[in-house]
From Swiss-Prot:
Binds 2 magnesium ions per monomer. The lineage of its organism: Bacteria, Pseudomonadati, Pseudomonadota, Alphaproteobacteria, Hyphomicrobiales. Its cofactor is Mg(2+). Homodimer. Mg(2+) 2 binds at residues 226-227. It catalyses: N-(5-phospho-beta-D-ribosyl)anthranilate + diphosphate = 5-phospho-alpha-D-ribose 1-diphosphate + anthranilate. This is Anthranilate phosphoribosyltransferase. Disulfide bonds: none annotated. It comes from Bradyrhizobium diazoefficiens (strain JCM 10833 / BCRC 13528 / IAM 13628 / NBRC 14792 / USDA 110). Pathway: Amino-acid biosynthesis; L-tryptophan biosynthesis; L-tryptophan from chorismate: step 2/5.
Length: 337
């Protein structure tokens, strides 16, 4: 506790924490050793000053050390967003996950219920009939047998219950909004992470590099989406072979048409589930296109596609052959088995 007091005192001066100091502070918070006042003070001091790459790296390391892990193949990927983009869009990363799985790449999907939108990954999967409250070994079985499994964040990060009330009372974004997507319980080394603000694109790629990721894209749409968008360019920071590159991608690069922002608007969980099922059934739409765009990027990250155009072709084959839909049906069966 004295360590935590000195760390809070350091942050109060505007100084940055080392990776180890951040890990120690967040370990104390998630272990229930910190008081609500200490947690609130530290979180807001970091937020106002702006969290550094080392602070986020240490915080993620602490969160990962406390999570309930899942065994997944070494080539598994995750497609995940921070949420909090305020767009109320359809569930892009969830749909893209089935497309990627149908293309032969195992997916260990990490997600939660809606935080700021009307429908998060967990909400839409539950509406589709997938059982989401599985034990880690059951999720591992889904990934092995179905090529896709869903890890419901609260079930795998029980230590988060110690910071939950403080986060609710603060009612504003904190570093915790960034930690979840970087703390995949299956320990995947290949990720596509969407973020709610352009300012976090490159820093989070650096955090993933620090924590041993092999291949990753961190993305933010120019329209504010925490996905690759089709309304205009998307800002990307990619990690490959230990190098980070920053660039933009456009729908045209992938051979896809642009769409109006309203075309990606979603509804509640049931409405979004119906829309997702229609994509998996092969129906053309802007939703299909944006899901293909994001799946294509994940296939590039996974090393299955050399570029977005090839990724879109592989994704379209996954949809049109029925493979992606078969993955959903299999996941519903195994998760409820």
């Amino acid at each position: 506790m004295d360590d935590l007091k000195s760390i809070i005192g350091k942050v109060a001066t505007g100084a940055s924490l080392s990776r180890d100091e951040a890990a120690s502070a967040f370990d104390a918070m998630m272990s229930g050793e910190a008081t609500p006042s200490q947690m609130g003070g530290l979180l807001m001091a970091l937020r106002v000053r702006g969290e550094t790459v080392d602070e986020i790296t240490g915080a993620v390391a602490a969160m990962r050390s406390k999570m309930l892990t899942v065994t997944a193949p070494p080539d598994a990927v995750d497609i995940v967003g921070t949420g909090g983009d305020g767009s109320g869009s359809v569930n892009v990363s969830t749909c893209a996950s089935f497309i990627v799985s149908g293309a032969g790449v195992p997916v260990a999907k990490h997600g939660n219920r809606a935080l700021s939108s009307r429908s998060g990954a967990a909400d839409v999967l539950a509406s589709l009939g997938v059982r989401i409250d599985l034990r880690p070994e059951q999720v591992g079985r889904c990934v092995r047998e179905c090529g896709i499994g869903f890890m419901f964040a609260p079930a795998h990060h029980p230590a988060m219950k110690n910071v939950g009330p403080t986060r609710v009372e603060l009612a504003t974004r904190t570093i915790f909004n960034l930690l979840g997507p970087l703390s995949n319980p299956a320990g995947v080394k290949r990720q596509m992470v969407g973020v709610f603000s352009r300012q976090w694109v490159q820093p989070l790629a650096q955090v993933l590099k620090n924590l041993g990721s092999e291949s990753a894209w961190v993305v933010h749409g120019s329209d504010g989406l925490d996905e690759i968008t089709l309304t205009g360019p998307t800002f990307v920071s990619s990690l490959h072979n230990g190098e980070i590159r920053n660039f933009e991608v456009t729908p045209e690069e992938a051979g896809l048409p642009r769409c109006e922002p309203g075309a990606l608007k979603g509804g509640d969980a049931d409405a979004n589930a119906i829309a997702l099922q229609s994509v998996l059934n092969g129906k053309p739409s802007a939703y299909r296109d944006v899901a293909l765009m994001n799946a294509a990027a994940a296939l590039v990250v996974a090393g299955r596609a050399k570029d977005l155009k090839e990724g879109v072709a592989l994704g379209a084959k996954s949809l049109d052959s029925g493979a992606a839909n078969a993955r959903l049906k299999h996941l519903i069966a195994v998760s409820n088995g």
